[in-house]
Amino acid sequence: MAKAFGKTSGSMLPWLGLALILLIADQFTKVLILGYYRLGDATYVTSFFNVVRVHNTGAAFSFLASASGWQRWFFTGLGIAAAVFIVWLLRSHAGQKLFSFALACILGGAVGNVIDRTLHGYVVDFLDFHYGNWHFPAFNIADSAITIGAIFLVLDELRRVRRS
């Protein structure tokens, strides 16, 4: 049985592999968007989904997007710090499957968005879900991976609390 803290059995390599797959999927889709779409271009796919090209200089939901530019480096540093911390956690808890899956998702997404901020100064978003005139803020594969990872972290904690 895995311990709540401390080393557990298992290799972190499969989790790093999952993070790498998510990172590659994220960057590949962003390369396609940057290559085929100009800023603001949109393809209407369904009555509720578009593919668009949006540049997000802020964080989730464009938080701090209108700041003077310092946020690029702040969020880049935060992403790097999160990635280092996640790798450290994976080394210690690789045998905890649900926890490690969640961390791998967050790691892949965080690194994907750090790459964008470093190369472009913004994160490339392109998935646009909407209903009528209401639009959910555009997002990308990295954002999806981070969200899925966060959901699984909560589920893992609920499972852990339920067992105790």
UniProtKB/Swiss-Prot annotation:
It is a multi-pass membrane protein. One of its GO terms (molecular function) is aspartic-type endopeptidase activity. Its EC number is 3.4.23.36. The chain crosses the membrane at residues 15-35, 70-90, 95-115, 135-155. It catalyses: Release of signal peptides from bacterial membrane prolipoproteins. Hydrolyzes -Xaa-Yaa-Zaa-|-(S,diacylglyceryl)Cys-, in which Xaa is hydrophobic (preferably Leu), and Yaa (Ala or Ser) and Zaa (Gly or Ala) have small, neutral side chains. GO terms for cellular component: plasma membrane. Keywords: Aspartyl protease, Cell inner membrane, Cell membrane, Hydrolase, Membrane, Protease, Transmembrane, Transmembrane helix. It comes from the Bacteria. It is found in: Cell inner membrane. The active site is at D125, D143. The keyword Transport does not apply. This protein specifically catalyzes the removal of signal peptides from prolipoproteins. Belongs to the peptidase A8 family. This is Lipoprotein signal peptidase. It comes from Polaromonas sp. (strain JS666 / ATCC BAA-500). The gene is lspA.
